[in-house]
């Protein structure tokens, strides 16, 4: 669907960060960047931003939200396109980002570009629609500022995911066919994470794409012909806490213990005749 790459405002991009950018670019999916932990000592939004821009370019990596305050004084974020009351100390940075966004948005439509070059102001609706287009094509990567522990900037990020990322209802299979999504469909999902838990052993994380998986049921690994697995308890994860559930419907993320031959990127389904997901 899309990718959210989380960057550390203290330590900057890591080896895994570069790999995440590379894989998401190869897939041709929309991408967001989140500069997290901005409330920590030595956190530096601008330095992290510049490190990203070294690899992708200033006209591609553009903050959509800019932080107000630094380290322990980090208190909120402002939208560079729509917020009007901007603190004086970040006004120049916000204005520069707004200009970069308007340039990118104007490029999504010839008529929009002509009017923009003639000095005409774009409406809020035109900006929103152009923003969706440029993010969808991957020509721009919005950057967000936040602190997950202080819950600053996270609501804005979640709202943007809903507004700008592709709808999960528009899912296609590996052969390009559009897939019907709904509770009434046969359950199918994709594995996105595997880890070893000291108490539960190997945990496999699955996102349900369509249908509803049930606890204590058999599933087929469509990515590995002939492989059949058994879902025992389905677990909702909240940090280290595990909550067993009986079922997991569309959009749900759950974990399952002790799968033997299922790996990251594999498609699992209750129907062996389904087509794997990309």
Regions found by a protein language model. Name each.
Residues 1-278:
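Structural and coupling elements of P-loop NTPases
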